[in-house]
UniProtKB/Swiss-Prot annotation:
Example GO biological process: translation
Record's keyword terms, sorted: Ribonucleoprotein, Ribosomal protein, RNA-binding, rRNA-binding
UniProt cross-references to Pfam families, sorted A to Z: Ribosomal_S19
Function according to Swiss-Prot or TrEMBL: Protein S19 forms a complex with S13 that binds strongly to the 16S ribosomal RNA.
PROSITE patterns listed in its UniProt record: RIBOSOMAL_S19
Oxidoreductase in keyword set: no
Gene Ontology cellular component terms for the protein in this record: cytoplasm; small ribosomal subunit
Lineage: Bacteria, Bacillati, Bacillota, Bacilli, Lactobacillales
Entry-linked Gene3D superfamilies: 30s Ribosomal Protein S19, Chain A
Record family assignment: Belongs to the universal ribosomal protein uS19 family.
Record GO terms (molecular function): rRNA binding; structural constituent of ribosome
The keyword RNA-binding belongs to this UniProt entry's keyword annotation: yes
Name of this chain's protein: Small ribosomal subunit protein uS19
Length: 92
């Protein structure tokens, strides 16, 4: 179930302040954030945002097709190492 249209998209205020400061600055640097729940706005395009995945900050370069999605969608929290190998060969 999506968010109600009358509420509008959500962005943490502290993240929005950092993005606005970055857009106005000449030099672009990585913005660190723990806000995985924030929606990507059009003014985020071209910025690199380091999103926390529970262990480290994953750098996410924001492109136009990411607008409207959440930041957490681009920083996976679980590492898949594959299923255990079949031990039938070693048992012989």
């Amino acid at each position: 179930m999506g968010r109600s249209l009358k509420k509008g998209p959500f962005v943490d205020e502290h993240l929005m302040k950092k993005v606005e400061a970055q857009v106005n600055a000449e030099r672009k640097s990585v913005i660190k954030t723990w806000s995985r729940r924030s929606t990507i706005f059009p003014n985020f395009v071209g910025l690199t945002i380091a999103v926390y995945d529970g262990r480290k900050h994953v750098p996410v370069y924001v492109q136009e097709d990411m607008v409207g999605h959440k930041l957490g969608e681009f920083a996976p929290t679980r590492t898949y190492r594959g299923h255990a190998a079949d031990d039938k060969k070693t048992r012989r």
